[in-house]
């Protein structure tokens, strides 16, 4: 069986790891260190570590791989292939050169578009109608190696980061399973990326999460979809942060300053943008409160909201 080092961290990576465990000999798993999670800051292992522990696989968790003791240990292994999927660190050249068959990455975009750490978020924020999975060889430069295989998938109007993450996670494992035999046999072909067409999807920053209502409704809607259910787009109402998990677009002829609540229905809070498409907030969370449907919030506040300004 092919001896593989797997490197990944979040839920996206777990379906790939499960497939590799079923089909090949995973001799080591490299992931990020345990991190404090939640209000109580409980030290929590990354999802990939949980899978690895279930199968009693050796786990390495370097804070930074380059120059680490873990790297020195990995370099002693007899390995055929390195597979990464959302690992979260660049690999040092010494590790890239280790496996006989090279190092490959499962990336959640149609490269060369959306290189970087947040390709699913950015594709939805940008209003793309499709995205996909790329299997490519790894090089020192971020997400720039030769493409081995690709498969596209449609982004539906009601998709958000959560739904696309789940679809792409499965697609990534399936495409890798189809692609690996030719890599192992040495019969695969690969195509260089066109660097002139490269775009980048940097990790989401806090400032990317705040909604600017002075934009077309479609852009605001895509931002909400592209940040839900994590890290979640937010606005401010009555000096209180308001996270928006779900919304829809509605046509309106009411002319109001962007950010103004122009109407409430039984199920939504409707907010003006800078064009004739308003945003209907359907699922929300006020700071310090539990997440709730707008319908539940409106049962006690419907008559007091119209005319308020979100900023």
From Swiss-Prot:
GO-annotated cellular components: cytosol
Keyword Protein biosynthesis: yes
Domain of life: Bacteria
Catalysed reactions, semicolon-separated: L-methionyl-tRNA(fMet) + (6R)-10-formyltetrahydrofolate = N-formyl-L-methionyl-tRNA(fMet) + (6S)-5,6,7,8-tetrahydrofolate + H(+)
Chain positions recorded as (6S)-5,6,7,8-tetrahydrofolate binding sites: 109-112
Primary enzyme class: transferase
Known EC number: 2.1.2.9
Transmembrane annotation, as ranges: none
Keyword terms: Protein biosynthesis, Transferase
InterPro entries named among the record's database cross-references: Fmt, Formyl_trans_C, Formyl_trans_C_sf, Formyl_transf_N, Formyl_transf_N_sf, Formyl_transferase-like_C_sf, GART_AS, Met-tRNA-FMT_C
The keyword Hydrolase belongs to this UniProt entry's keyword annotation: no
Role of this protein: Attaches a formyl group to the free amino group of methionyl-tRNA(fMet). The formyl group appears to play a dual role in the initiator identity of N-formylmethionyl-tRNA by promoting its recognition by IF2 and preventing the misappropriation of this tRNA by the elongation apparatus.
UniProt record similarity statement: Belongs to the Fmt family.
Name assigned to this protein: Methionyl-tRNA formyltransferase
Lineage: Bacteria, Bacillati, Bacillota, Bacilli, Bacillales
Chain's gene name: fmt
């Amino acid at each position: 069986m092919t001896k593989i080092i797997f490197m990944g961290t979040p839920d996206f990576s777990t379906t790939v790891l499960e497939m590799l465990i079923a089909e090949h000999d995973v001799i080591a798993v490299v992931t990020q260190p345990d991190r404090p999670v939640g209000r109580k800051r409980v030290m929590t292992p990354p999802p990939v570590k949980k899978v690895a522990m279930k199968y009693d696989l050796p786990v390495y968790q370097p804070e930074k791989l380059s120059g680490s003791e873990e790297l020195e240990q990995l370099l002693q292994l007899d390995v055929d292939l390195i597979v990464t999927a959302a690992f979260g660190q660049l690999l040092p050249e010494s590790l890239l050169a280790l496996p006989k068959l090279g190092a490959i990455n499962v990336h959640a975009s149609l490269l060369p578009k959306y290189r970087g750490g947040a390709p699913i978020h950015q594709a939805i924020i940008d209003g793309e109608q499709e995205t996909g999975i790329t299997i490519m060889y790894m090089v020192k430069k971020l997400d720039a190696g030769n493409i081995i295989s690709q498969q596209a998938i449609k982004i539906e109007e009601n998709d958000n980061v959560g739904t696309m993450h789940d679809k792409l996670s499965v697609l990534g494992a399936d495409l890798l399973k189809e692609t690996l035999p030719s890599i192992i046999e040495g019969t695969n072909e690969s195509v260089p990326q066109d660097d002139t067409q490269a775009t980048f999807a940097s990790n989401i920053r806090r400032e990317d999460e705040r909604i600017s209502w002075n934009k077309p409704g479609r852009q605001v809607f895509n931002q909400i979809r592209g940040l839900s259910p994590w890290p979640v787009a937010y606005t401010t109402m009555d000096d209180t942060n308001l996270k928006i998990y779900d919304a829809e677009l509605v046509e309106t002829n009411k002319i109001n300053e962007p950010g103004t609540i122009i109407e409430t229905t039984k199920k939504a809070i409707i907010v003006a943008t800078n064009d004739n498409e308003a945003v209907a907030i359907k699922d929300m969370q006020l700071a310090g409160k539990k997440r709730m449907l707008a319908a539940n919030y409106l049962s006690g506040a419907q008559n007091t909201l119209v005319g308020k300004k979100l900023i």
